[in-house]
């Protein structure tokens, strides 16, 4: 009997990952937001055929929204200031807040470094949500507190596709394990509110919300026990 090693044998492994990412919005998403960041928690299981299946949860975070003057201009004075309770200035910061969850499958199509590492593709399908999140640093502007914010937050939900080209490196000594890659998120969404207070118009159209980005994933591998060969 002999023990399988990552260096010379294809192994079954569970991969737990934590990933920062940077995305550029495209299509309808670019009409609402500037570039944004994401943090991903992932689980993938690789079998002895170098095929994968798993789950990703992405949390989106951005610090800049397009057209804020148009969206919130009706709530400011002639100088563009937000006047809070008791006549104090309110400090308002608007950004993107969102999430995406996908079920993924994929495979290594070109091995490199060892039989468990190399270039791979992952394809996932799931759900996506994005909205404008407004932070009131002094808590003194009730006009943009719930439920009033709902008329301005551009909350959208819909079905999503996540396509990734990645390089996977599983260390021969099981110490340093990571993925780097390029990802395209494609979502077809619709406004949950159905109406925008600032425009006074119905918002019922489907949106094509795309984003493209780069990510780095730090992996914790958990190998199947007692893998051996004759």
Per-segment meaning from a language model:
Residues 16-18, 22, 58, 140-145, ...:
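A generic hydrophobic-segment detector
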Residues 3-13, 48-50, 110-118, 170-178, ...:
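Short loop/turn motifs that connect adjacent beta-strands in outer-membrane beta-barrel proteins
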Residues 1-56, 60, 217, 221:
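Short glycine/proline- and aromatic-enriched beta-strand/turn motifs that initiate or cap beta-hairpins
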Residues 55, 95-133:
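Internal, conserved structured core segments that host functional sites
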Residues 20-22, 41-45, 57-59, 101-107, ...:
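Residues on the lipid-exposed face of transmembrane beta-strands in outer-membrane beta-barrel proteins
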Residues 163-230:
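Predominantly the C-terminal beta-signal and adjacent terminal strand-loop region
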């Amino acid at each position: 009997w002999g023990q399988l090693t990552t260096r010379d044998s294809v192994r079954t492994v569970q991969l737990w990952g934590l990933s920062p990412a940077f995305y550029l919005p495209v299509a309808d998403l670019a009409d609402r937001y500037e570039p944004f960041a994401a943090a991903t928690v992932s689980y993938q299981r690789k079998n002895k055929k170098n095929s994968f299946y798993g789950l990703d949860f992405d949390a989106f975070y951005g610090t800049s929204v397009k057209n804020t003057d148009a969206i919130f201009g009706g709530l400011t004075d002639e100088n563009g200031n937000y006047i809070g309770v008791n006549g104090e200035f309110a400090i308002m910061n608007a950004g993107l807040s969102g999430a995406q969850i996908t079920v993924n499958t994929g495979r290594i199509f070109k091995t490199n470094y060892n039989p468990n590492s190399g270039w791979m593709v992952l394809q996932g399908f799931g759900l996506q949500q994005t909205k404008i999140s407004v932070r009131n640093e002094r808590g003194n502007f009730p006009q943009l507190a719930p439920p009033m914010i709902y008329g301005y937050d551009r909350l959208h939900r819909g079905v999503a596709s996540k396509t990734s080209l990645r390089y996977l490196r599983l260390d021969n000594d099981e110490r340093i394990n990571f993925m780097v890659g390029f990802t395209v998120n494609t979502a077809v969404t619709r406004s949950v509110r159905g109406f925008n207070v600032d425009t006074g118009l119905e918002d019922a159209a489907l949106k094509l919300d795309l984003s493209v980005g780069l990510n780095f994933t730090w992996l914790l591998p958990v190998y199947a026990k007692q893998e051996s060969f004759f």
